Amino acid sequence: MEKNKNNLEEYGTRRVIEPASVLPPSAWRLDNRREIYPDEIRIMVKRVHLEPTSFKQISLECGNDEAKMRRKILDITLRRGKLHNPVTDTGGLLYGVVEEIGEDYPNEKKLKVGDEVICNASLAGIPASFTSVGEIYRAYTQVEVEGYAIAFGKIPLIRRPEGVPVDLLLFAFNESGTLYRVSREAVGQKKILVVGNNIM
């Protein structure tokens, strides 16, 4: 895709289809085309951690029928261009493998094609396209998927730490991903304020 950048595009605004002039998490629908802009990165998604409220809502709506749950997840992604549950207004996290890196992507972590990564930002704001949903792991509210997602410069990607199971990593980052980022930023005598609910 061509370069045509303004200062909000590192947050993914050019991927917004509707409504116009909002950030991706607030959009109803995103452009999830596979081709990337020069400052984007594409990830081959292998597993998704659904936010627990979303997982429960989908499960109840589908009568705990896993075939229906798979179709529902695919339907949400097809209609919205992202895995953003319209009932609960929540997303989740993803794990996958770096597939392509744009030439202008701000690659501070020096990621390479083939690196395993966890996206430490909600799927509510990330363009994604899934072709299939596989195994469902109810204990962790996670599903195996085949497909891809597009990340922007301001989306935090974390190289998978060795020796820790993916299901536990996704679960932990879903619960305390902000604290992980704070641990990297809170150096010296910096003052950090964490605002949220259900922290304890």
Q: What name fits each language-model region?
A:
Residues 21-33, 78-81, 94, 177:
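Short linear interaction motifs
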Residues 1-26:
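N-terminal intrinsically disordered, low-complexity, charge/repeat-rich segments that act as generic
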